[in-house]
UniProtKB/Swiss-Prot annotation:
Residues 1-22 form the signal peptide. GO terms for cellular component: extracellular region; host cell postsynaptic membrane. It comes from Cyriopagopus schmidti. Lethal neurotoxin that blocks neuromuscular transmission. Acts cooperatively to potentiate the activity of huwentoxin-I. This toxin is active against insects. The lineage of its organism: Eukaryota, Metazoa, Ecdysozoa, Arthropoda, Chelicerata. Residues 23-48 form a propeptide. Its main location: secreted. PROSITE patterns: HWTX_2. This is U1-theraphotoxin-Hs1a. Keywords: Disulfide bond, Neurotoxin, Postsynaptic neurotoxin, Secreted, Signal, Toxin. It is found in: Secreted.
Amino acid sequence: MKVTLIAILTCAAVLVLHTTAAEELEAESQLMEVGMPDTELAAVDEERLFECSFSCEIEKEGDKPCKKKKCKGGWKCKFNMCVKV
């Protein structure tokens, strides 16, 4: 009886983890679609620009240059802005 219960709970946990991973992959693939509208791409670009600029402003100390935070997805922080690599 205990073995059956453990097996059922294990299968349920694996199913939940698998479903979550599949949903994440689906969301990523939708972002990477070639036919993605320009408005959605612009929103992603603006978000990265804001995130990078904001993090540089927080990390700036006096007249030292800001510490460059790694931007994700082929972007880098330069002159308090995210630029494509």
